[in-house]
Amino acid sequence: MPELPEVEVVRRGLDAHVTGKAITAVRVHHPRAVRRHEAGPADLTARLLGMRITGTGRRGKYLWLTLDDGDEPLARRAESSVALVVHLGMSGQMLLGPIPKEDHLRIAALFDDGTALSFVDQRTFGGWLLADLVTVDGTDVPVPVAHVARDPLDPRFDRDAVVKVLRGKHSEIKRQLLDQTVVSGIGNIYADEALWRAKVNGARLAESLTKPKLAEILDHAADVMRDALGQGGTSFDSLYVNVNGESGYFDRSLDAYGREGEPCRRCGAIMRRDKFMNRSSFYCPRCQPRPRVRRA
């Protein structure tokens, strides 16, 4: 599933290539792709026609395009009040260029300059919906994103406030890193990478860690996601690509995730994998020892 760096790569591509364009046609090829838009495909299509993209936004793994009615010149328009929220799901792709002729095309939009944007989604977990913008903590976000906390790459991210929240949590630190209401954007891959860098096992209770160690984990999460962003994100297959259809290559630089049975790059111990929340956690048993189970 795309995490923060992968979504940010897509956002940057869209921001550079679709901002300022007006939508002249929309076709929904699969109803599941608009199931989150409660008014249905016809309403989504009708409302998007003639709207102009004024910008892009992201919080954590959530991506959106801000819109207006397209009637006023760009310089005289008020701030947007509605957004097209894009859920990439497990395999969603926002592709620029000619509309592809393939079975997994879900939505296609044409612009006033003759270019097109296609939403391709093999597993159909993603989709589009229109939502109003609301102001939360000084930032305009779509209503479905209002509950999501700021992510470590957000300029207004308050690391100390998040550390304070984590210190009060009687649950595993990895579980808290994946909680989008505590801190957003850190998915399974980058949680494992941050914990490996901090030499902390994900099964440790958040409340058992010191404030400096929690701050270190958050700093590592930010650093590893910046590193991934610089390499176009992490792609294990062809499902994650940027707006030009190109895969990222940070998977070659991963220190923990997916490295079960391989030597730890730091100490040489054999990396292990544990089941966790219907996912897998990868860690070094020497650098990141599991917490001891207290006997009653």
From Swiss-Prot:
Gene3D superfamilies: 1.10.8.50, MutM-like, N-terminal (3.20.190.10)
Positions contributing to DNA binding: H104, R123, K169
Function: Involved in base excision repair of DNA damaged by oxidation or by mutagenic agents. Acts as a DNA glycosylase that recognizes and removes damaged bases. Has a preference for oxidized purines, such as 7,8-dihydro-8-oxoguanine (8-oxoG). Has AP (apurinic/apyrimidinic) lyase activity and introduces nicks in the DNA strand. Cleaves the DNA backbone by beta-delta elimination to generate a single-strand break at the site of the removed base with both 3'- and 5'-phosphates.
Cofactor section: Zn(2+)
Protein family membership: Belongs to the FPG family.
Cofactor annotation remark: Binds 1 zinc ion per subunit.
PANTHER family: FORMAMIDOPYRIMIDINE-DNA GLYCOSYLASE
PROSITE patterns: FPG_CAT, ZF_FPG_1, ZF_FPG_2
Transmembrane segments: none
Alphabetical list of SUPFAM superfamilies matching this protein: Glucocorticoid receptor-like (DNA-binding domain), N-terminal domain of MutM-like DNA repair proteins, S13-like H2TH domain
Gene encoding the protein: mutM
Protein name, entry field: Formamidopyrimidine-DNA glycosylase
Subunit structure and binding partners: Monomer.
